Amino acid sequence: RRAIRRSCGLSCGIKWPNDLVLNRKKLCGILTELGLEGESGAVDYVAVGIGINVSQTSEDFIPEVRGVATSLAQALTPPPARNILAAAVLAALDDMYASFPAAREEYLKRYRAGCLTLGRPCRLLRADGTSEEAFAED
């Protein structure tokens, strides 16, 4: 969120747990993996995959996602240069990594403040294909 705000001037919301949303449409997806050292519990590695829709028009998305996906090009003319956006993402990740875990509570506070899902009804999808209505609580 910080990288997009700093490089583009746009404010995104978070759709729990790992999507960034702009104008009620998915702009970005984030996947993470964390490895801990067995005995100490210290962080061994963090792998982060970030996909930001930068230059797509609505026609570039397959019909099934056109109504729920967006890109920076649809919000800004011109869209940001990819190198500027990538540098902003790397700087934000660097800042977060350098201050974690000391700033953990601050990150959780920011996440909660930006989360569009908390306090709202949602649908819980299970691995077996079943689902049920739920309420997103902190």
Descriptions of predicted regions:
Residues 14-16:
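Short loop/edge segments at beta-strand edges and connector loops
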